[in-house]
Amino acid sequence: MQNSPIPSPWQFIKENIPLLMVALVLALLLRFFVAEPRYIPSDSMLPTLEQGDRLVVEKVSYHFHPPQVGDIIVFHPPELLQVQGYDLGQAFIKRVIALPGQTVEVNNGIVYRDGQPLQEEYILEPPQYNLPAVRVPDGQVFVMGDNRNNSNDSHVWGFLPQQNIIGHALFRFFPASRWGQLGSFTFVPARTIINT
């Protein structure tokens, strides 16, 4: 029995170029149209997301339905931030607080949506600022970071056009100790205690 000659590295590459090209095209299609990895560069989403976390952002679902309250989204900066020097290629990550037609207000450390106080168990601390009631226009959303007092978000620059949304942050894959699905948070109006 004879041993087959070992192919040269060049011959191996030449024989596998079509396979490598198909793999590259598939990887690029997935990256640009289905999902992409993202790195968290700031503390604006503490305690939900920490600086250095790495996420998978899916890009398909918002083509079939709009974002929902509680979704954590990744988006390109709106026009006001671009005027301030942010590049359109940069990405932000925040939580959707209100949808078109809803009102948002921040008063005495409480966020209100449509006049109802929100019970926000995921925030780092209550906001130390006030925001008069504003109505979200059609085609836009109101977003806030979970680290309310250290977040450049809609309370600073206004509404986010839905066309700026890149995708929905679904899964943290790094660090391994915090690995898991992010999901959406269901907002529950705060309970009012009435003393009788």
From Swiss-Prot:
Pfam families: Peptidase_S26 (PF10502). GO terms for molecular function: serine-type endopeptidase activity. It is a single-pass type II membrane protein. It is found in: Cell membrane. The active site is at residues 44, 94. One of its GO terms (biological process) is signal peptide processing. NCBIfam families: sigpep_I_bact (TIGR02227). Belongs to the peptidase S26 family. This is Probable signal peptidase I-1. It comes from Synechocystis sp. (strain ATCC 27184 / PCC 6803 / Kazusa). The lineage of its organism: Bacteria, Bacillati, Cyanobacteriota, Cyanophyceae, Synechococcales. The gene is lepB1.
